[in-house]
Curated annotation (Swiss-Prot):
Compartment(s) of residence: Cytoplasm
This protein's encoding gene: ntrC
Protein's organism: Bradyrhizobium sp. (strain RP501 Parasponia)
Post-translational modification: Phosphorylated and dephosphorylated by NtrB.
Main location: cytoplasm
One protein family per Pfam: Sigma54_activat
Name of this chain's protein: DNA-binding transcriptional regulator NtrC
Domain Sigma-54 factor interaction: 140-368
Residue intervals of the Response regulatory domain: 5-119
Family annotation (PANTHER family): DNA-BINDING TRANSCRIPTIONAL REGULATOR NTRC (PTHR32071:SF95), TRANSCRIPTIONAL REGULATORY PROTEIN (PTHR32071)
Membrane spanning residue stretches: none
InterPro entries to which the protein is assigned, alphabetical: AAA+_ATPase (IPR003593), CheY-like_superfamily (IPR011006), Homeodomain-like_sf (IPR009057), HTH_Fis (IPR002197), P-loop_NTPase (IPR027417), Sig_transdc_resp-reg_receiver (IPR001789), Sigma_54_int (IPR002078), Sigma_54_int_dom_ATP-bd_1 (IPR025662)
Length: 480
């Protein structure tokens, strides 16, 4: 007896043949068609236990067919496949009630697994298709495999309120992912409130998040609502969560556990209804090991982990991204621009330490500062060239410029190796190079007093002594 009846609709004969062979070997009865009309006739007659359909067919788009299928047979699982591979082709099937979205080409083993899972699930699954209005803008751009995986995860999350933890380097677009999750999810009609934990003074974080009552502290002349209250019914995006102080982490954990909070200076618990999406450019597991982040809070936030890849891992998306940013610049009144083939190759060879944000800034700069319609490789070379180091300039690099100085050094360091990739062990080599002058400077400033140097550095005295020994740092004591 067949494991189930599968209806397959795709206008590509080769795709139909491959799916027929794979599904038949897995024990399913398969019916094939190359058009939407036949698929709709089968569905309306009550045939099939599951549907696999392409988006684009000769007579009708699957996006238009899906709502009719779900209205007639709400418990019929529908798997949508597409070669278009954009954010919207991933999100629209989910919005219209599809069980799963698969970008072409896909792994047949994965398809068989998804089919088995869909048929095994309880049939009381009820879809909640969105309205049929067109979306005004596409928040995420890219067709690379890395982005396809993000789209698929987002599509699965749209009709849930699960807490999401987004990780990724600075400039990768973590807030854009959070906004997409809100704007196309079930809370889209509620507010989206973003809080950058790194930008709030330490002593004001709890007031910022939970609000305060009049007289709660000096200067609190009126009651103020917090971000939880402002995000009620919507999404609260906690950016740079790794910078949250431990005491605020404790209060946040309590809110996640109990679903309520109290304002600073308040006594009455307030129920909260928000979806939490957190993000960090730091490895929270390392912060946990260092005693800087609560492990129990991490597990509460990390219900669905989502990593946004750096631009260098999705460099094939660069042409789409640069066109997108040029288009945005044109909408802001800047002249239209294009890149020639050599200029595009130059961009693909760049390491992009600032990720997508760096590319966006470059696109706007090109649109604003260069008169030619077509940007050439020479312009790109000039824009991406590291700044010239003048005599004595290294002596003037201050703390505010340390990140930029390290970035410039690393860019030069990487370019000195074949294919721009240095040998393994870079992390520890770079840390050692930075650690030695840092410890030496602290010891010099404290005249060799290791207790004062440890306090200055924020290290345990025994830790400092071990580092001095391991790094073979000479300690010179002086009087005074």
């Amino acid at each position: 007896m067949p494991a189930g009846s599968i209806l397959v609709a795709d206008d590509d004969t080769a795709i139909r043949t491959v799916l027929n062979q794979a599904l038949s070997r897995a024990g399913y009865e398969v019916r094939l068609t190359g058009n939407a009309a036949t698929l709709w006739r089968w569905v309306s007659q009550g045939e099939g236990d599951l549907v696999i359909t392409d988006v684009v067919m000769p007579d009708e788009n699957a996006f238009d067919l899906l709502p009719r299928i779900k209205k007639m047979r709400p418990n019929l699982p529908v798997i949508v496949m597409s070669a278009q591979n954009t954010f919207m082709t991933a999100i629209r099937p989910s919005e219209r009630g599809a069980y799963e979205y698969l970008p072409k080409p896909f792994d047949l083993k994965e398809l068989i697994t998804i089919v088995g899972r869909a048929l095994a699930e309880p049939k009381e699954r009820v879809s909640s298709p969105a309205d049929d209005g067109e979306f005004d803008s596409i928040p995420l751009v890219g067709r690379s495999p890395a982005m396809q995986e993000i789209y698929r995860v987002l599509a699965r999350l749209m009709q849930t309120d699960l807490t999401v933890m987004i990780s990724g380097e600075s400039g990768t677009g973590k807030e854009l992912v959070a906004r997409a999750l809100h704007d196309y999810g079930r809370r889209r009609n509620g507010p989206f409130v973003a809080v950058n934990m790194a930008a709030i003074p330490r002593d004001l974080i709890e007031s910022e998040l939970f609000g305060h009552e009049r007289g709660a502290f000096t200067g609190a002349n009126t009651r103020a609502s917090g971000r939880f209250e402002q995000a009620e019914g919507g999404t609260l995006f906690l950016d740079e969560i790794g910078d949250m102080p431990m005491e605020a982490q404790t209060r946040l954990l309590r809110v996640l556990q109990q679903g309520e909070y109290t304002t600073v200076g308040g006594r009455t618990p307030i129920k909260t209804d928000v979806r939490i999406v957190a993000a960090s450019n730091k490895d929270l597991r390392i912060l946990i090991q260092q005693g800087l982040f609560r492990e129990d809070l991490f597990f509460r936030l990390n219900v669905v982990p989502l990593r946004v890849p750096p631009l260098r891992e999705r460099i094939e998306d660069l042409p789409d991204l640069i066109r997108h940013f040029f288009s945005l610049a044109e909408k802001d009144g800047l002249p239209p621009k294009k890149l020639d083939a050599q200029a595009l190759e130059r961009l693909k060879q760049h390491r992009w330490p600032g990720n997508v944000r760096e590319l966006e800034n470059l696109a706007r700069r090109l649109a604003a500062l260069y008169p030619q319609d077509v940007i050439t490789a020479s312009v790109i070379d000039g824009e991406l060239a590291p700044p010239a180091v003048t005599s004595g300039s290294t002596a003037t690099v201050g703390v505010d410029n340390l990140g930029g100085a390290v970035e410039a050094y690393l860019s030069s360091h990487f370019s000195g190796f074949p294919n721009g990739v240095p040998p393994p062990g870079l992390y520890h080599r770079i840390l050692k190079e930075i650690e030695i002058p840092l410890l030496t400077a602290a010891l010099a400033a404290t005249r060799g007093n290791q207790i004062r140097a440890a306090d200055l550095l924020g290290l345990n005295r025994n830790t400092l002594r071990k580092k001095i020994r391991d790094l073979d740092i000479q300690v010179y004591r002086s009087g005074g």
